[in-house]
């Protein structure tokens, strides 16, 4: 039998960035690998847009669904296939974290509505506000009432799935963090981003001043990402055979 400690985290890459972005900073999995300091045995990369099969649930410890330059409302074949996989993964109680496109895809897969945000783009380092229910969330209770995170998106979750709990908002987006089950959540912001990644992702017609700011003090979004990763790991006592 495969040891739980050997199971990798699936990094589900949803489409590929523009060539100029890839040239500067690589593709989405690299950003998560660097943010979490993952070693080669810690993860596997799955690319549904290249026709790759999504992983069997008993072969992975959890999954992160990446951001994308695509739109959920385009209903691409690979996106719809990934949405069906999300529904099955939720039923299987697999730890899931959706980020930006992944956030919208999870909400859509579970019955929410995704569309262009009527309030327009969110870009750059922006303040978020957590709801009181966050303090009762086992994974997220350490987050402060307010923190800043990197954002870059035009579409949003306009209406969350009926069973989802909204845990954070921003000025332009009422669904910044959604909790679907004890194992599954999604975030509209980019916990894997740094100022360098944000700057590299800006299109030519957007001022570099969007990325002028930087996080001061604790990077709470990154801590959320790290906490999710640790959630997928076996307990230390189990790893030691206690």
Enumerate the language-model features and the residues they cover:
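Amide-donor transfer/coupling interface in amidating biosynthetic enzymes
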Residues: 3-14, 35, 91, 130-242
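Surface-exposed, flexible loop/turn segments at secondary-structure boundaries
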Residues: 17, 51, 71, 104, ...
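Short glycine-/acidic-enriched loop or helix-start segments at secondary-structure transitions
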Residues: 21-22, 55, 74-75, 107-109, ...
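Cysteine-nucleophile active-site neighborhood
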Residues: 66-134
């Amino acid at each position: 039998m495969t040891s739980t400690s050997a199971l990798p985290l699936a990094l589900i890459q949803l489409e590929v960035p523009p060539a100029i972005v890839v040239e500067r900073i690589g593709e989405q999995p690299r950003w998560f690998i660097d943010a979490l300091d993952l070693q080669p045995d810690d993860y596997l990369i799955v690319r549904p847009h290249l026709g790759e099969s999504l992983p069997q649930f008993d072969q992975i410890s959890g999954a992160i669904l990446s951001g994308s330059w695509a739109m959920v409302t385009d209903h691409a074949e690979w996106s719809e296939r990934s949405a069906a996989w999300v529904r099955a993964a939720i039923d299987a109680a697999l730890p899931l974290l959706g980020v930006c496109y992944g956030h919208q895809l999870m909400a859509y897969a579970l019955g929410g509505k995704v569309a262009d945000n009527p309030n327009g783009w969110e870009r750059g380092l922006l303040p978020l506000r957590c709801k009181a229910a966050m303090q009762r969330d086992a994974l997220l209770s350490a987050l402060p009432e307010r923190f800043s995170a990197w954002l870059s998106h035009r579409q949003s979750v306009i209406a969350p799935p009926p069973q989802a709990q909204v845990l954070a908002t921003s000025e332009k987006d009422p669904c910044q963090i959604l909790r679907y089950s004890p194992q599954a959540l999604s975030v509209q912001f980019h916990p894997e981003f740094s100022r360098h990644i944000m700057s590299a992702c800006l299109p030519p017609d957007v001022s570099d001043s969007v990325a002028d700011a930087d996080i001061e003090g604790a990077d709470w979004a990154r801590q959320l990402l790290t906490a999710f990763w640790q959630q997928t790991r076996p307990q230390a006592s189990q790893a030691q055979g206690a």
